[in-house]
Amino acid sequence: MSRLSKEEISERLLELIKDETKPAIGCTEPVAVAFTVATGKKYMQGEILKIDLKVSKNILKNGKSVTIPNTEVCGLDIAGALGGICGDPEEGLFVFKNVNKDYLDKAREMIKNKVVTLNPIENTDPVFVEATLKGEKDEVIVILRRGHTNIEKVIVNGEIAFEKDNKNEKDNKDCDFMKELSLKDIREITEDISIEKLGFIMDGIEMNKEAAKEGLKRQKGLTLGSSLLKLQQEGKLGKDSATIARILTAAGSDLRMGGGMCPIMTSGGSGNQGLCVILPITVVAEDIKAPKEKLQRAVFFGHAVNNFVKKYTGKLSAICGCAIAAGIGATAGITWLLGGKDKEINGAILNMLANLTGMVCDGAKGSCAIKLSTSASEAVISAYLALNDIIVPNNTGIIGNTVEDTINNLGMLCKDGFYKADDVMLSIACKEVI
């Protein structure tokens, strides 16, 4: 374990999970763009005449095809326009909270009049937005980096109005400390942490269950969840926990990708990852009638493992983090919930990695529900397989000598092997913009 004491590690892990597990309305990439513009608007006097947006290719890929909440439209340009019209930076990940038809009409008028420009830029952090706002009196430049609401710098009329102190940037410390942990360390912290500190976990469980219910009712996104439910009602799909997890996770993603206004608890800064971590664990807990405290700890474990994996793969990457990192978190939480020890927990993770490694990210959109639903059901199945001693052998393919070695292999594959593949995918998915 780290040079820090176990108590310090536990507190730091809790702080990280709380920071990366917050409610959000809408996909967090358009949110990041709207939040950046809304922040700039706060520093301006008078009307916005021009908005120039520069975004990382990963922000572009993950934001261009997902529906903005309470609208039927997609696009980072319109997200930026809405941020300038009705965005409130104090709302954070709820920046789209005030969107309505009148504001949408104004945003469309801005796009029509070419008030907003959008360009991808190379060689920057995966999470990066720069917004230049020009008004009647002021010019404001806002830079967001490394987090969907992490404003790094604000420049007003050539003068620095705000600059974040990055010398003690806790994100970097968190990354270092997480990589010093093992899965066993995280499991031990999960079991030892005071249950009084995990109240926010139940908030996320209830929030994402409600989102799944709404997704089944409303015709949003791909409508995969309601379609799978119909197949189940017709007797073409079973009523086991893997299938139920598949249906509910798909429904939650339908709602989120389809512009629903229902808040969703994130994991690792992503709403889809929050759905994929929380819902499968919750379904299994309800199936086995697990005590509330055990469910809370299992979901906390799932969040922690998701974040652990993403310290290797990156916050936004070439692989589908929602299906792979979050799915790994879910299967770890499920296996622990079902009484699995380190051998079975690690085995379930290896089963997921042997199965889903290679699932690429081709951007946030309605069909993300398919990937999430696959991961949700496989997370349940992988856990039960590991508990029945069906575990992929070490040193075969992507699987290394230990589970930590394997996650490191995933990170190497993602950052070194898939780097060019991600560029190709970006050129395919964003060819009309790049």
From Swiss-Prot:
GO biological process: L-cysteine catabolic process to pyruvate
Cysteine pairs bridged by disulfides in the record: none
Highest taxon above the source species: Bacteria
GO molecular function: L-cysteine desulfhydrase activity
Entries under Pfam families matching the protein: SDH_alpha
TM ranges: none
PANTHER family (alphabetical): UPF0597 PROTEIN YHAM (PTHR30501:SF2)
Similarity remark: Belongs to the UPF0597 family.
Name under which the protein is recorded: UPF0597 protein CLD_2616
